[in-house]
Amino acid sequence: MTEEHVVYIGKKPVMNYVLAVITQFHEGAKEVSIKARGRAISRAVDVAEIVRNRFLKDDVDVKEIKIGTEELPTADGRTTNTSTIEIVLARKT
């Protein structure tokens, strides 16, 4: 999967990311990856479920879900663990 078929979830409203995912599929992508970390993980799950159940109901399915942990440096030089998720949506064949 190329980097252009990745949607990074942040603090914007959920529907902004839903539109980004739908746009990727309409431009011909076979798979779209939704990535988030920390507090944005629940928003990423919401995006995947809205796309899968409301907009592209018969066309898209969850192919893979990866979870993990990243160590991020803090301002005082220490590191903190942050949870990550990647949800791969694939067009049904």
Curated annotation (Swiss-Prot):
Belongs to the histone-like Alba family. GO terms for cellular component: chromosome; cytoplasm. This is DNA/RNA-binding protein Alba. It comes from the Archaea. One of its GO terms (biological process) is chromosome condensation. Gene3D superfamilies: Alba-like domain. The modification N6-acetyllysine is found at K11. Its main location: cytoplasm. Keywords: Acetylation, Chromosome, Cytoplasm, DNA condensation, DNA-binding. Acetylated. Acetylation at Lys-11 decreases DNA-binding affinity. Binds double-stranded DNA tightly but without sequence specificity. Involved in DNA compaction. Transmembrane segments: none annotated. It is found in: Cytoplasm; Chromosome. NCBIfam families: DNA-binding protein Alba, PRK04015.1. One of its GO terms (molecular function) is double-stranded DNA binding.
